Amino acid sequence: MQCLMDILAKELSNPASSIYKHTLQGFMDQAVRQSNAQYHDPDFLGRLMINLQESQPGDKGWDIFMLDYRVHDLAPLATVFTEDVMNNYKKIFNFLWRIKRIEHQLSNTWRTYKEHVHKFEKIRGMKDIFHRLNLCHHEMLHFMSTIHNYIMVEVLESAWKVYLDDLKVVKDLDELIEFQRKFVDSILDKALINEKNNDLYRNL
């Protein structure tokens, strides 16, 4: 994901109206070739697609970017991964993508700071300004690290463990579909991105 974001960063910083799916698809293919993703099953990689969400005034490419996985032509999977389930996975992706975007931006900001700080640190008053900037940057990193750890451990890993336990006792297709729905709903609920938490999510 880091490789993909590095490659896409410049393009996604453009206005959403100037973003084209085929251009981003080329960048994703490049990211696959330059990362460990190249060792995944070719069929899996062939089903990974880029989609663009409907844009709003002022949106950048970051705001409309979406990774999708094609399952509609695989009868067994399509039965379990219904349209409603896939839409919920898109909500989860959007949430995780925003977190990764913030982490990526903080990392780039720090890199830029380290590259240019020596040019200004001898200017009177700048040392104190840079000190406060460092403190602010540290607080943001700490906050994002806390959010990231919560999502990984308390949300994703916790829900995945329950899902794997459910799969050990599944009796039929209907139960499998229900377990899949429960898995996704658990993530949405704990990550505060389901409908009942819409107001809280917007405030955050």
What are these regions (language model features)?
Residues M1-L204:
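Extended, charged interaction scaffolds in large complex subunits
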